[in-house]
């Protein structure tokens, strides 16, 4: 009897330079999310079909072109789906914050070798994560992880998620968890103030949900602030020269230990909930897709306009996350106004900035009550 195994592979060129990321010679803006392969009730034990579904959600529903496997290599079925869909994968070594003793480091180094051997035939894999996420500098250890991975795969660059400015850069790309945004001012730090070597590639490996969690049952105003937070950092990472792209934190809510999260062992950091139901923040990503058919149009309104849910029964800020050129507001059959994205506003660098609805009346008071709209 003959055992047989088929392995798919592909060819493409990858380059990180000071000016950004290039795939097959074309500049590509990385727009992705981090992914925990954790699910409600089942944990990590979901079958291949559900692992593949996450790749489809990222690519088709959310319009992402990249994903970071935080903080460990993930299901082969997920990587297979990323290959098929054309979803770039930043694969990361296992670990979180802690670096142990010599025996621990030897095992971590072996984990790195196994990660490369298991994943290197996947053309979707474009970047190796060789630092333990959130850890401090350790020159001797991280020299070994870089060398081990480059020895097994000299074709792909290495990176590692740094949590402080100007940490030691042994990798090919400086990846930075940028949680600097607090709702005003620049939404991400200046690249030149973070990386110790501006000649190398630079990307934002995390931002967003950890700074501003939102439960799916939070009120509209809270969910809107989270969505606008994601939009602001996405915008500023695109606008800043030399940033290869960003990975928002994160795809979906996930279970955690009691010391981290909201006290119920759940982190509500995702743009989707544990069951993969989208929150408003998911529309920030989905609305950046280029519509090629009417079915590709995304239209998500931040408010249901249910007066009983609004403080004082008064509508507050209302935004539409859409990739349409404009939206029209009607009150019943009466036309109120047409609204378009502000191409000079806070989100001007986005392909499709969210649209603010700031007039709910138009000329209706004049029409029905004889009142001057002015």
Model-derived regions: residue spans:
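An acidic-aromatic loop/edge-strand motif
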Residues: 3-13, 17, 250, 267, ...
């Amino acid at each position: 009897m003959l055992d047989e195994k088929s392995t798919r592979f592909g060819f493409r060129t990858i380059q990180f330079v000071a000016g950004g990321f290039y795939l097959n010679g074309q500049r590509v803006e990385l727009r992705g999310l981090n992914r925990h392969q954790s699910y409600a009730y089942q944990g990590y034990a979901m079958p291949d079909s559900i692992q593949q579904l996450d790749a489809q959600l990222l690519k088709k529903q959310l319009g992402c072109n990249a994903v970071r496997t935080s903080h460990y290599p993930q299901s082969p079925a997920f990587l297979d789906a990323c290959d098929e869909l054309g979803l770039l994968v930043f694969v990361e070594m296992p670990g979180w914050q802690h670096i142990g003793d010599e025996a621990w480091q030897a095992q971590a180094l072996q984990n790195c070798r196994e990660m490369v051997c298991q994943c290197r035939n996947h053309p979707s894999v474009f970047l190796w994560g060789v630092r333990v996420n959130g850890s401090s500098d350790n020159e001797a250890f991280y020299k070994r992880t870089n060398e081990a991975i480059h020895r097994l795969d000299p074709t792909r660059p290495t990176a590692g998620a740094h949590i402080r400015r100007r940490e030691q850069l042994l990798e090919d790309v400086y990846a930075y968890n940028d949680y600097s945004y607090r709702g005003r001012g620049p939404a991400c730090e200046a690249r030149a103030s973070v990386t110790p070597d501006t000649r190398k590639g630079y990307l934002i490996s995390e931002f967003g949900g950890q700074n501003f969690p939102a439960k799916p049952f939070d009120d509209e105003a809270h969910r809107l602030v989270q969505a606008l937070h994601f939009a602001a950092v996405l915008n500023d990472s695109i606008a800043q020269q030399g940033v290869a792209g960003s990975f928002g934190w994160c795809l979906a809510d996930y279970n955690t230990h009691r010391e981290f999260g909201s006290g119920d062992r759940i982190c509500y950091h995702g743009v989707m909930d544990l069951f993969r139901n989208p929150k408003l923040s998911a529309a920030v990503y989905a609305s950046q897709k280029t519509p090629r058919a009417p079915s590709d149009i995304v239209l998500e309104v931040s408010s249901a306009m249910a007066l009983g849910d609004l403080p004082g029964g008064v509508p507050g800020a209302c935004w539409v996350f859409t990739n349409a050129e404009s939206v029209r507001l009607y009150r019943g059959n009466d036309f109120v106004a047409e609204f378009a994205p502000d191409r000079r506003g806070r989100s001007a660098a986005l392909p499709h900035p969210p649209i603010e609805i700031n007039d709910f009346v138009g000329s209706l008071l004049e029409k029905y009550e004889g009142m001057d709209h002015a």
